[in-house]
Amino acid sequence: VDRRQRQMCIRDSCDFKDKSLKRLAKQMAHVMYKNAGCGLAAPQVGVLKRMVVIDCDQEDGQRNPIVMLNPVIVAREGDPVEEEEGCLSIPGISVPIARPPFARCRYYDLDGQLWEIEGDGLLGRCLQHETDHLDGVTMFERCEPTARLKALQEYEVALAAGARPGETSVEG
């Protein structure tokens, strides 16, 4: 895993006056959709900013990305449920991770307006997974030690078979 992904982003690292954030959001959404993802955090593309793009409702073919600046999980509810998770930065594998099924997240949009989003199932899991990236936590740190060892071995096999983690970078 790229060492940049294990770095924590500063809590309020996105300045709403920064015009480059709109361009970055568009690039991140492009990378996410190109790689069939439902979420992408800025550290995954080499940018240490607290910024996430998610779209967990693509079944109807419509793209409705939500750009989240300085997101913070403000609530997690329910007994942890173990489900397989994948990650665009660690292609070719999935890992069983136990998370509470419900999450509520507070964030700002690109115009600096404060929002809250909440969800369970895929959305709740995605909110938690992507904000983990902002805190320097990958799915390897979230899984049980035996699952971690198995996942690392599978990742080596995936890399040997052609999986390329660097394909999530955005062009400057």
Language-model segments: residues:
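Divalent metal-coordination and catalytic microenvironments
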Residues: M32, I73, H129
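Acyl-group handling in specialized metabolite and lipid biosynthesis
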Residues: R11-K19
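Helix-adjacent hinge/juxtasegments
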Residues: R50-P91
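Charged, well-structured alpha/beta interaction segments
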Residues: Q27-L48, V53-D57
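Short pre-active-site segment immediately N-terminal to the catalytic Zn-binding motif
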Residues: D109-R125
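Post-HEXXH active-site segment of zinc metalloproteases
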Residues: P91, G124, V137-G172
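Active-site His/Glu-centered metal-binding helix of metallohydrolases
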Residues: C126-D135
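Single conserved hydrophobic/aromatic residue that forms the stacking wall/gate
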Residues: V1-I10
